[in-house]
Design a protein with these regions (language model features):
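Electrostatic cytochrome c docking/interface patches
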Residues: 26-46
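Extracytoplasmic electron-transfer domains, predominantly the class I c-type cytochrome c fold
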Residues: 71-120
Length: 143
């Protein structure tokens, strides 16, 4: 029993210590002129289901300040923005936009939004109608 208490104390102490390693996270400034332009229905879906990882308008939940969750969330957002950042869409070349739309076409049926994200943010779930609308909007039917 003493060993269990000792292990618990060390784990608790470690958990408390890692809280000192905070992620310095801020959204970059948003320039609406650089944002993606899409029909209202498409923008609604993108903002609801994609913007928390793929824009400069991330709304962090309360648990985003708890390590190690904060580290993983920061990593996911950084990776998401590298893949596509809807806040800077107009800075992409036509070729980059075309490629990103093609990837969006594929990913809305395969992996996005991530299941772990949807589990914590049920409103972000895409319906079949949402998925079809996004795919139709991209204009990237399979070759």
């Amino acid at each position: 029993m003493l060993a269990i208490k000792t292990i618990f104390k060390y784990l608790l102490g470690t958990f408390l210590l890692i809280q000192l390693i905070q992620v310095d996270y801020e959204n970059p400034p948003v320039n609406k002129h650089l944002e993606i332009q899409a029909p209202k229905e498409v923008m609604s879906i993108l903002k609801r289901s994609c913007y928390d990882c793929h824009s400069n308008e991330v709304v962090l939940p309360w648990y985003a300040n708890i390590a190690p969750l904060s580290w993983e969330m920061s990593r996911h957002i950084d990776l998401g923005r590298k893949w596509v950042n809807f806040s800077i869409w107009q800075t992409y070349t036509p070729e980059q936009k075309d490629k990103k739309l093609e990837e969006l076409y594929k990913s809305v049926y395969r992996v996005m939004p991530l299941q772990g994200y949807v589990a914590l943010h049920p409103k972000a779930a895409l319906t079949q109608e949402d998925r079809k609308l996004l795919r139709d909007w991209t204009g990237k039917a399979p070759f």
